[in-house]
Structure formats: C-alpha cells, structure tokens
A protein has these predicted regions:
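Low-acidity, Ser/Thr- and Arg-rich intrinsically disordered low-complexity segments
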Residues: 2-10, 14-16
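Conserved N-terminal beta1-alpha1 strand-loop-helix module at the mouth
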Residues: 19-226
Length: 226
C-alpha cells in the first residue's frame, strides 16, 4: 500500500475514508437445543456458550454439546463454561467438545493446564474486592455478578469502571429490557446473556434471543451513524 502524508491527501480522499464500524460482541450462553443453536446462527451472534457445570439448569454433557457445536460455523466461537471443575472434567470437555474458549473464574485457571490452541476467557466477579490491575489489558475477559445464572444485574458503575480500562464482556442479569441501558451507560466490548433469553430455566426462547440481538444491533447502527 502507498502511504500518503496529510498534506498530499485531498478533502475528497479524507471524507471517503471511514472509520471501522463498531460491533458489540454478543455471546448467548447456556445453549441446550438444536433450535436455539440454529437461531443464534441465523441471527449472527459472535460466541456460543455451553455450560458444563452440573449444578446448572443449563448443564449439557460434552457429547451432546459436541453434537450441537458441529452445527455451528467457524466464525462463531464455541465457549465451554465451567465452574470450579476438576482436571478430569476439564480434560473431558476439551477432548470431546473441543472449544475455542474455556470460560472459568480467573482463580480456576491458576491450577488448570489449558492447551495453547484454546483461548482462556477469565471471569472476574463483582464481589467488591476486584483489583483491576489483575485483569489483562489485551485478553478478552468477562465481568459478572457474584453468582452465575442468578439473573441479577451487575452493578452499572462497577461495570463502567472495568469496561473503561479492559476488553470486557458484561454478563449477569441482562435481558431485552435492560441491555440498551447497559450499552448506553457502560459501552462494553461485548454482552453475554443466558437466563434473560429463556422461557424457563434451561430452555431458550428463540423470540427472546432475536429481540435481544435486534436491540444490540440497533444500538450499534445508531453509534456508527453518529
């Protein structure tokens, strides 16, 4: 490419150069059915989360998750969501499900071996003791409340403080009624929704998924036109 100095660039050339369009990353978590997976594919989400924590109503076995993940195109990242797993559980999920990302509490990664082919998605919780200096400046991370899947909205001011400094996905209690407010006030890199797009615990509503995605993409479009 030929570089031009500012003095050699005409006004028409300058106006034709557009800044990269902003796109909020969308992660739909807790997928358990083929219909929900097909819905997120058709509506262009960025990350698909499968929960391997047995205490969750969204729990899915690695084998069943692999069958659903095989439907997902490569441009959508597959995320294995685990909570305080044993090394054996981690190895089974990695071997059978073959995720792009492994999502766990940041502390869980300290004693867990992860192959270099898999990205880590560390979860930092809004527990009032968070040290921002511990969060990577370059790696994608997730910020949510003290308990996953509770449906409780993460503190807006705390989310804002984290998002200003880090590459953060905001999770915890998001739904179609509050995501726009969070986007406007926090402006995170991404949003993660689970219970907020369900008809009942563990069962995704395609209508709610579509509505949530539409609100986020309309926000993106408005921001890009400002």
């Amino acid at each position: 490419a030929i570089s031009r100095s500012p003095s050699n660039t005409t006004e028409d050339e300058s106006s034709s150069k557009q800044a990269p369009k902003m796109k909020t990353l969308i992660k739909i978590c807790g997928l358990t059915t083929a219909s929900a997976v097909e819905c997120i594919i058709e509506n262009s989400v960025d990350m698909a989360g499968f929960v391997f924590a047995k205490q969750s109503p969204r729990y899915i076995t690695p084998k069943n998750a692999k069958q659903l993940a095989d439907l997902i195109p490569k441009h959508i990242s597959k995320v294995a969501v685990m909570l305080h797993p044993t090394p054996t559980e981690v190895n089974e999920v990695i071997d059978v499900f073959k995720p792009d990302y492994l999502q766990m509490d940041a502390k869980d990664f300290l004693n867990t071996y992860i192959p270099k082919s898999i990205e880590s998605l560390k979860v930092y919780r809004d527990d009032g003791c968070l040290d921002l200096s511990l969060i990577s400046d370059s790696k994608l991370t997730l910020f949510e409340g003290t308990k996953s899947g509770s449906g409780k909205l993460t503190n807006i001011e705390h989310s804002k403080a984290v998002s200003k400094k880090k590459r953060v996905i905001i999770a915890g209690g998001l739904n179609s009624n509050n995501v726009l407010n969070v986007l406007n006030k926090v402006g995170p890199l991404g949003v993660d929704v689970s219970s907020g797009v369900e008809s009942e615990p563990g069962l995704k509503s395609e209508q709610k998924i579509i509505q949530f995605i539409r609100i986020v993409r309309e926000y993106d479009e408005k921001k890009n036109n400002e």
